[in-house]
Amino acid sequence: MGQRPFSPNHRSGVLNATTAGAVQFNVLGPLELNLRGTKLPLGTPKQRAVLAMLLLSRNQVVAADALVQAIWEKSPPARARRTVHTYICNLRRTLSDAGVDSRNILVSEPPGYRLLIGDRQQCDLDRFVAAKESGLRASAKGYFSEAIRYLDSALQNWRGPVLGDLRSFMFVQMFSRALTEDELLVHTKLAEAAIACGRADVVIPKLERLVAMHPYRESLWKQLMLGYYVNEYQSAAIDAYHRLKSTLAEELGVEPAPTIRALYHKILRQLPMDDLVGRVTRGRVDLRGGNGAKVEELTESDKDLLPIGLA
């Protein structure tokens, strides 16, 4: 008899039960499995890594052999598959002990296992991606106030380095690098939107922290220079450029990108930034109001309504 195709409405995979829907899966920081605000015990690092691997491929079947390779890499023990199954049983028991029907979440399905998550709000990664994509779309259309709300919401999901308690596993390192790129993109676009809305003063401290953590990330330096300049701190903008230039020269032997050098020369000559800021101040910034309000028409009280999380 052929295998029944997976369907979210199939009884063994239904996640509409109140208890199952209350489970939260978090990877943007140490791995967490929460039930109504209570962290559930996840066991040894290898057992947590099995859950992490399933969570990164949520709603898809992960082969047992793929789990073995991810956990033990090049030197799995002879009974590795049996050990993986033991980890799965332990995780199911943890869910069951918390009052959750584990059959609705952790499913055995050839050639391995599937972690079922029926609601995107149950996973911090899904919430981050959804808010990020909405923010980038709003930013591309020039709706910068709307972009700020989405991008700030995306960053609220982060608690620390991706799967920070499992960084010794190669699959975590690879995933973390890719996702960190997304996080930095969100920070960059959030700074751009805030500067467009006249809130450079709010993002400058955050940008300073970010360039200290990511000294080669020229897109962050660009926003920092622009933020200082439009906030009438020309000397600080010039200093930021020289800090970047020294870092790149001493550690990589390269010059800043042409766009960064062009921005620096405009700052030296005290030229207007119409190509970088004027373009956005002509755009609408509030989708919800529907009145096409421009940035220059925002009052100071309007600007104060922008997310304080920017700081």
From Swiss-Prot:
Substitution effect: Y113A: Shows significantly reduced transcription of the moa1 locus
UniProt keyword annotation of Metal-binding present: no
DNA-binding region, residue intervals: 15-117
Cross-referenced Gene3D superfamilies: Tetratricopeptide repeat domain, Winged helix-like DNA-binding domain superfamily/Winged helix DNA-binding domain
Statement: the UniProt record of this protein carries the keyword DNA-binding: yes
Gene induction: Expression of MoaR1 appears to be modulated by oxygen availability since it is up-regulated in both microaerophilic (NRP1) and anaerobic (NRP2) cultures compared with aerobic cultures; thus, seems to be up-regulated during the shift into the persistent state in the human host.
Keyword line: Activator, DNA-binding, Transcription, Transcription regulation
Parts forming coiled coils: none
Domain of life: Bacteria
GO MF entries: DNA binding
Pfam families: BTAD, Trans_reg_C
Any one biological process term the GO annotation gives: regulation of DNA-templated transcription
Family membership: Belongs to the AfsR/DnrI/RedD regulatory family.
Role noted for this protein: Acts as a positive transcriptional regulator of the molybdopterin biosynthesis moa1 locus, promoting the expression of the moaA1B1C1D1 genes. Binds directly to the moaA1 promoter.
Protein name in UniProt: Transcriptional regulatory protein MoaR1
Organism of origin: Mycobacterium tuberculosis (strain ATCC 25618 / H37Rv)
Taxonomy of the source species: Bacteria, Bacillati, Actinomycetota, Actinomycetes, Mycobacteriales
Name of encoding gene: moaR1
